[in-house]
Curated annotation (Swiss-Prot):
Extracellular topological domain: 119-155, 385-417, 870-879, 944-961, 1025-1034
Calmodulin-binding subdomain A as annotated region, ranges: 1097-1114
UniProt-recorded name of the protein: Plasma membrane calcium-transporting ATPase 3
Function: ATP-driven Ca(2+) ion pump involved in the maintenance of basal intracellular Ca(2+) levels at the presynaptic terminals. Uses ATP as an energy source to transport cytosolic Ca(2+) ions across the plasma membrane to the extracellular compartment. May counter-transport protons, but the mechanism and the stoichiometry of this Ca(2+)/H(+) exchange remains to be established.
Amino acid sequence: MGDMANSSIEFHPKPQQQRDVPQAGGFGCTLAELRTLMELRGAEALQKIEEAYGDVSGLCRRLKTSPTEGLADNTNDLEKRRQIYGQNFIPPKQPKTFLQLVWEALQDVTLIILEVAAIVSLGLSFYAPPGEESEACGNVSGGAEDEGEAEAGWIEGAAILLSVICVVLVTAFNDWSKEKQFRGLQSRIEQEQKFTVIRNGQLLQVPVAALVVGDIAQVKYGDLLPADGVLIQANDLKIDESSLTGESDHVRKSADKDPMLLSGTHVMEGSGRMVVTAVGVNSQTGIIFTLLGAGGEEEEKKDKKGKQQDGAMESSQTKAKKQDGAVAMEMQPLKSAEGGEMEEREKKKANAPKKEKSVLQGKLTKLAVQIGKAGLVMSAITVIILVLYFVIETFVVEGRTWLAECTPVYVQYFVKFFIIGVTVLVVAVPEGLPLAVTISLAYSVKKMMKDNNLVRHLDACETMGNATAICSDKTGTLTTNRMTVVQSYLGDTHYKEIPAPSALTPKILDLLVHAISINSAYTTKILPPEKEGALPRQVGNKTECALLGFVLDLKRDFQPVREQIPEDKLYKVYTFNSVRKSMSTVIRMPDGGFRLFSKGASEILLKKCTNILNSNGELRGFRPRDRDDMVRKIIEPMACDGLRTICIAYRDFSAGQEPDWDNENEVVGDLTCIAVVGIEDPVRPEVPEAIRKCQRAGITVRMVTGDNINTARAIAAKCGIIQPGEDFLCLEGKEFNRRIRNEKGEIEQERLDKVWPKLRVLARSSPTDKHTLVKGIIDSTTGEQRQVVAVTGDGTNDGPALKKADVGFAMGIAGTDVAKEASDIILTDDNFTSIVKAVMWGRNVYDSISKFLQFQLTVNVVAVIVAFTGACITQDSPLKAVQMLWVNLIMDTFASLALATEPPTESLLLRKPYGRDKPLISRTMMKNILGHAVYQLAIIFTLLFVGELFFDIDSGRNAPLHSPPSEHYTIIFNTFVMMQLFNEINARKIHGERNVFDGIFSNPIFCTIVLGTFGIQIVIVQFGGKPFSCSPLSTEQWLWCLFVGVGELVWGQVIATIPTSQLKCLKEAGHGPGKDEMTDEELAEGEEEIDHAERELRRGQILWFRGLNRIQTQIRVVKAFRSSLYEGLEKPESKTSIHNFMATPEFLINDYTHNIPLIDDTDVDENEERLRAPPPPSPNQNNNAIDSGIYLTTHVTKSATSSVFSSSPGSPLHSVETSL
């Protein structure tokens, strides 16, 4: 049989090697022997098997297993195997305890500085700078000593320590809940991943962790191999081993050439059967993980940030990051055939920047920079005004000279002014934003699980809210994927229902039963129903299940045929793939000849038919004219009824004329048509309504299918994707390519832009067509807004399109492991309606963040202006240090929790998507922010300057330093908090709706937080005393504060009345970053790709990491210094009490990147290194040409970037290589 792709081993070991040597636990192989064997490849491996075991059957005997029956499924035997050979599981790293996480949080440099600052401020509260009593220094040096000074200083130090404790606890809790959520998600995915094995002669689906050495495993297209093994039998098997070897080409496997299969590799084509020889830490991938894990722990001690040590491990292709902040690990290629050049190329690809899909992150980045700039300008102006005010008053108005002894006092003032400037900057940054984004995404992801959406990449959740187009598969997503044959053409007769067996000639019936039974995957079966009265269970490929069901409907059974001709007796198999669109199987006949059975798409296979069986079962000629008649009279009517048409044919080869089996075109030709069947796959009843919802929501749904154009059009009409009378396009793949390519065969974006807006159905399409369409829509700039595209996929070849899409949906039931790995969200029920729910949740996330932004920016605008004017006019702040701590730390945190957990409503689907370019802060939101800021500032300044007259109380404006808290400033603080509390209710609506209470009781978290905050505020005001700079208020004063707060709701209605369109002066904010703002260095990254979307979003990632994190870190560091410096230099009795305002410890959640990716958590340093890496060289400058290597390039890069999720050492081996 030579080079046959389908090779099976004849089990005849050599006589001298038939003696099985009993070894470990009664088995004939030791663990070390098997590990050594699996390190070999190709001819070397075959030679070793031959020398040591005779052949694969000898190896099976040594392992006490049967190549056809498998293990006996005996619990004791399985347990014994686990003890001797290990279990298919990598021992998990122990989760960190809460105290360990607290200790880690304390290691933060900023917090250490804050801790030191707190201790120093406690010590310095008793320190008096020299020269403060000197008359020569003028009135700046103050007057009488205050007894409460030491106490007040102690309170300031305690306030800083309190803020540190709060930050540490919140950070530790965040990390703990993140780790818990990740482990929960990981274990759920692990339980769902199963693999097919043969035990007791029965095909069983077992969890991958239950695989043992000696199991006989069925390998099929799309599988991710969970263990190492040796092939027993293979049909046209091709494996992608790039994850281990760095070899990008698919490797053909056969029992007589290269039988070694490795865990973590993907089956790209064909099927087969293997005996498992190594599992868990003893498999090739497991050995690498173990080595890396050991190196990782040492490395972790050296470098907490997880930077990778140079050396052997850097030449890796696959990167597997440990989720819990551990070291990023890289797999070293095993014996790569390509040598150093290949290795270098793969390394560059592995280090290439990961595609960042999040539209939201780009907008938040831009907004953060805008806010930062505004804050910087305000703070600079504040410092300049204060310094000028002080210098003019001291040295010009009072005519004093600079004395050496007064220098510490003057320096103290200058430091104080600088601190005020920094405070204005700090107040300007919305610290609660990272937390709001984290909470909103984490909350949504958890809830989306109940809606059958398993989110693998967090940013996909919010990106889905912006989706403008969905490219959906037909089978299983829009349809039920329970297929049945309802029409057939047999023996010159078109049957509209299942024919009676007696109506068919025995020869036709016999040929049909054999063609279907043999030329189908033997793993595909029809099993009895689980419950009485239920439908029979379909296991395996659904189209083949329909054909096997047809055999049963004809009162025949396929199982006896399969027993008569077992799988290892099949001579040659041409497996189905997206290029062939057919499957063919060759068997040897008793007379020494061969018979080929073939099945496939009718219009493709009929072209290869030269004969057809007539009503008597005899051959008659089948000319092109006959074929055209058949297409017109049989196939088109079936297709117009929405049926998939499959042709079943055969061909006989006489004993003397064995063809060249590798010449497929010659072998699968000159066929005789047995039958054409029409298979029905009913539309899911809930799909038409779901598509209507999408269309109302401004989302265009397109169907991309491999089916016949008429079938696709009929199903699209049933679903509501196309409506009668609409101007739309339904194209076949060939026509689509003709329209979008130029004379040279290159894709032109201009041509694509003429096709895709009207395209609704793409039939007879290949995965490349799907990728081309998705890329073309994403890259297009023709419409009013850039498109955000979601794609569904289930096949191995859908990987490139799923990766390219903004959001890739894989099928949880029908999807292959490869498709799941490439996806962002897995639909656990394979249902289109779940995509609509994902849109709803995505829009909800976007709105939640916008709500929080509206609330937070109102607080920030007011606080900045109050701080600025307070410092410049009264040289004091109405809001004291600990009060600011309460507002910034507690209210922002609580508000982010309250606004980020709003449940989604159907009304979210009644508006158009935002798209890529829509700003984060709309003009309506800007109107709300500025409108409420005007109201709040008017109230606060009125209270500040005339409040004491209105309430008939003492003014707090000119109170000496460290004097008891005044009622005046307490009223201002209380009113400020009340206004924020009621404005939080206003912030629930961001599109100008009037009823801000709509659905408020459906969110118990919001109600609890608002009431809880109000309760704590009462405690602070009435019993806070000196630590909170509060004086108890009377009932009347409380009622006035509440009255002003409720005024926010009334004022909100006034603002809603003003039409936004009339306010031309309002600008939107928070657009996505534009190309013109990018640096040359950033533009150089990924230069070979003509992909503006990726370029734009990659820049968002760079800015986010480099910009916001650094700004926030610098702010926190300066703030920490501010607190300690101030306490050291504070003049004891300055009438200008800026002191209380300045030592405001703020709550800042640690870096955005640290908090957001609960699932896809990547270390900042690691990301920065990746982002600075040079772009990978383009394999082919013409990215649009047919041969541009789209698939290979995308796939190779993915293994470096997508294994983030898998790398938790707790995952079983099957998930070592996937993002799952």
